[in-house]
């Protein structure tokens, strides 16, 4: 895990989708998708449920994102 991955994660939560997060961060969508996949595999949790309307955080994902926000605030 690194700070960039945490920023991507928080942006997905904030903007509701990987593509919207990529646009807001001026980042490549595949990079954000890969970062999300890496975090989910590293921590063995599903952070978001994927749907046709966007990304919805799971309960575990919501807690993980709250921790990520705290790290980014410091």
Features from the language model and the residues they span:
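Alpha-helical linker/hinge and terminal dimerization helices associated
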Residues: 42-43, 64-74
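The N-cap/first-turn positions of alpha helices
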Residues: 2-5, 29, 61, 68
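A short LG(V/I)-centered, amphipathic sequence patch enriched
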Residues: 40-57
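Hydrophobic residues on short alpha-helical segments
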Residues: 6-13, 58, 65
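Short helix-boundary/capping micro-motifs
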Residues: 10-28
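Helix-turn-helix DNA-binding elements, focusing on the entry/boundary residues of the two helices
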Residues: 17-18, 36, 50
């Amino acid at each position: 895990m690194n700070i960039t991955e945490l920023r991507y994660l928080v942006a997905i939560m904030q903007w509701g989708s990987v593509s919207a997060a990529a646009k807001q961060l001026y980042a490549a969508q595949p990079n954000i998708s890969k970062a999300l996949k890496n975090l989910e595999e590293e921590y063995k949790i599903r952070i978001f449920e994927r749907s046709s309307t966007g990304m919805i955080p799971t309960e575990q994902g919501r807690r993980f994102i709250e921790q990520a926000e705290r790290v980014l605030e410091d």
